[in-house]
Amino acid sequence: MRNQKIPRLRQSASAWQAGLVCFVFISFLSQALAQKVPVVEKHLDNGMTLLLVERHDEPTVAGGWVAHVGSSNEKPGMTGIAHLFEHMMFKGTPTIGTKNYQKDLEIIAAQEKVRDEMRAEERKMREMFRKGEIDDVAKPENKTPRWRELEKEFTKLIEQQRDVLVKNEFDRIYSGNGASGMNAFTSEDMTAYFCNVPANKLELWMWMESERLLHPVFREFYAERDVVFEERRMRTESTPLGKFGEEFNSMFWESHPYHWPVVGWPSDIPAISKAQADEFYGIYYSPQNITLILVGDLKPDAAETFAKKYFERIPRGKTTPPDVPTLEIKQEAEKRMNADAETNPQADILWHTVPFGHKDSYALDILGQILSTRTGRLYKGLVLGSQVATEAYADQTSQKWAGYFNCGGEAKEGRKPEEVEAGIYSEIEKLKKENVPAQELQKVKKYYF
């Protein structure tokens, strides 16, 4: 069990959007199961899975695909690489995103040559840091003279590449054909890409998505890597709540790869090479590790025909993507984190639980609903009853390899987070000693079914 008292963690915009997408998708699946909406499942010859749901409410199709790879599939020293693909997969193909593909390839090759030399200089700087000769390898004043020369060469190559690039062409093709909502997100366990297209543009979606899987070109790789690093700096490094959230997470998970942030550690992101990205892509973006999902105004047979025509062009991967071998160790002691920030006092308590699909996960979902919402026990007990909190919540989060249960609340002005903590434990003890009344349980079940 883990017990923490920390300020409430605020998610970044992209994390919130990703969470919303997941919520909408999971809500739809729950409704589909409850209403027995038929989901057609097909498997292409290359191992790719196709899920189809026919709905003729509107003349549109929500199309997406999931690569079953996230930050938990990374290795130490390469954290953030899964999230980087969320950016790189929009850079185009040999026919999308460039005016001169051959010139583009020549510039990319020249960039890699310069970067190889820069990495050699960076190894020297890390050795200088290890010996105490410099205090920070990232500071401009600590760069070696040769590294600075190479950086100038690389900047010139970037300028040359801009002359042959067609910026955001992938997005323009979609929007020019009536598509909307094109986006992507990365979590610990998956990376998803999605957009909405008019029903009569489904074949275009099939071509566009299969083309970027079959012929991806990772243009502006290092510039985009720097964008990701800046994204991390703005959302994590520059905000105390972001830093606390990262510390919170890394303390909770001791041995499992959930320990590191999805965006990656600050020293890892600048060290990711294009060669590493190419290898990662070859392993985890193979057809047998991808699921296509189409929901909307479609005919399953026609959609399957399109999928075979376009996606079966992609050869099956040579290797099976490995599972995550490291499991979370059993933790024997309570951990507590106290942090000060410019926010209302809050208490959060987390327990290690079970992963998605585990037989106990459903009972924990129900428990979360019993405790949460404005009709739940925590709100009634802590907000309306003892009035130590202005809000209170509970939730079970089941991830692919492990899960956690969270109870928390925001302290009312003049009250302490310790009082919120005590109130939460009081409600938990009641659940341990008394059965949940049938009427209360039935009300919660209706939420799901």
Give the predicted meaning of each segment.
Residues A18-Q31:
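Bacterial N-terminal signal peptides
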